[in-house]
C-alpha cells in the first residue's frame, strides 16, 4: 500500500451470490422497485395507513399478566437467547403504555375482574395473546370451581399460544402472528 492509494474502504456490496457474482436480492422485483423509486426521487410515497400499520407492527409494547409457570417462559422470551426486542417488541410495566397484553397462567374467578380492569386501561388498538393451556381453556385445573375456563370469557383474545407451558419459541411465533394480523387488518377504523 503506497501513499497514492486511498484509505477509504470500498463500498459494501452486501452478501454476494457465488453463482452469479451479484448481491443477493439484486434481481428481486420488490427491492428493485424500491431502489428505483429511492434513486429517482430520494423518498418513498405511501399511504398514511400503511405507515401507521408499519410503525405499529415494529413497536409493539407488551405488558405481562403472568399468573403461573407460563410467566417464566415469557421471561425467557426477553432474555438474550431469544431477544424479543429484535422483533420490535418491548415490555412495559403500565397498561397505559402497552399495546399487547400477554395472559400467561391460570385465571381464577377472583383474578378475572383485575384482568378486565387492566385490559380496560390499555389504549386502543389493544391486543391480547393467551399463552398456555391454562389461559386458553383452564388447562389442568379446568374442572376446579374457582378457575375461569379460558381468558377469552373475560377479554377478547387475538392469538392463542398452546402448550403447557409453551416454549419461548412458541410465544415468539405467536407475537410474529400478531404482527402479521396487524399488517393484514390495519389499525385505522373508518
From Swiss-Prot:
Task: Name the PROSITE patterns for this protein.
Answer: COMPLEX1_20K (PS01150)
List the InterPro entries: NADH_UbQ_OxRdtase-like_20kDa, NADH_UQ_OxRdtase_20Kd_su
Q: Which reaction does it catalyse?
A: a quinone + NADH + 5 H(+)(in) = a quinol + NAD(+) + 4 H(+)(out)
Note on how the cofactor is bound: Binds 1 [4Fe-4S] cluster.
* Main enzyme class: translocase
An example GO BP is:
aerobic respiration
Per its Swiss-Prot or TrEMBL entry, what cofactor is needed?
[4Fe-4S] cluster
Keywords from UniProt, A to Z, are: 4Fe-4S, Cell inner membrane, Cell membrane, Iron, Iron-sulfur, Membrane, Metal-binding, NAD, Quinone, Translocase, Transport, Ubiquinone
Q: Where does [4Fe-4S] cluster bind?
A: 69-70, 134, 164
Which topology term describes how it sits in the membrane? Peripheral membrane protein
Q: Which GO terms describe its cellular component?
A: plasma membrane; respiratory chain complex I
GO MF, one annotated term: iron ion binding
Its localization reads: Cell inner membrane
Which E.C. number(s) belong to this protein?
7.1.1.-
One Pfam family name from the record?
Oxidored_q6
Q: Give the matching HAMAP family.
A: NDH1_NuoB (MF_01356)
Instruction: Please give the family membership noted in the entry.
Output: Belongs to the complex I 20 kDa subunit family.
Q: What does the record note on quaternary structure?
A: NDH-1 is composed of 14 different subunits. Subunits NuoB, C, D, E, F, and G constitute the peripheral sector of the complex.
Q: What does this protein do?
A: NDH-1 shuttles electrons from NADH, via FMN and iron-sulfur (Fe-S) centers, to quinones in the respiratory chain. Couples the redox reaction to proton translocation (for every two electrons transferred, four hydrogen ions are translocated across the cytoplasmic membrane), and thus conserves the redox energy in a proton gradient.
**What is the protein's name according to its record?**
NADH-quinone oxidoreductase subunit B
Write the gene name. Answer: nuoB
Amino acid at each position: 500500500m503506497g501513499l497514492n492509494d486511498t484509505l477509504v474502504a470500498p463500498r459494501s456490496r452486501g452478501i454476494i451470490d457465488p453463482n452469479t457474482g451479484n448481491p443477493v436480492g439484486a434481481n428481486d422485483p420488490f427491492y428493485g422497485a424500491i431502489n428505483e423509486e429511492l434513486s429517482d426521487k430520494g423518498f418513498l410515497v405511501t399511504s398514511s395507513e400503511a405507515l401507521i400499520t408499519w410503525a405499529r407492527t415494529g413497536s409493539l409494547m407488551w405488558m405481562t399478566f403472568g399468573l403461573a409457570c407460563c410467566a417464566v417462559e415469557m421471561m425467557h422470551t426477553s432474555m438474550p437467547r431469544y431477544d424479543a426486542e429484535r422483533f420490535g417488541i418491548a415490555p412495559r410495566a403500565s397498561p397505559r403504555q402497552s399495546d399487547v397484553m400477554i395472559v400467561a397462567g391460570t385465571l381464577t374467578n377472583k383474578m378475572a375482574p383485575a384482568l378486565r380492569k387492566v385490559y380496560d386501561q390499555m389504549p386502543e388498538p389493544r391486543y391480547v395473546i393467551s399463552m398456555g393451556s391454562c389461559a386458553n381453556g383452564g388447562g389442568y385445573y379446568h374442572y376446579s370451581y374457582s378457575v375461569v375456563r379460558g381468558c377469552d370469557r373475560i377479554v377478547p383474545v387475538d392469538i392463542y399460544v398452546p402448550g403447557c407451558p409453551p416454549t419461548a419459541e412458541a410465544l415468539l411465533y405467536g407475537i410474529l402472528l400478531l404482527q402479521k394480523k396487524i399488517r393484514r387488518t390495519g389499525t385505522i377504523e373508518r
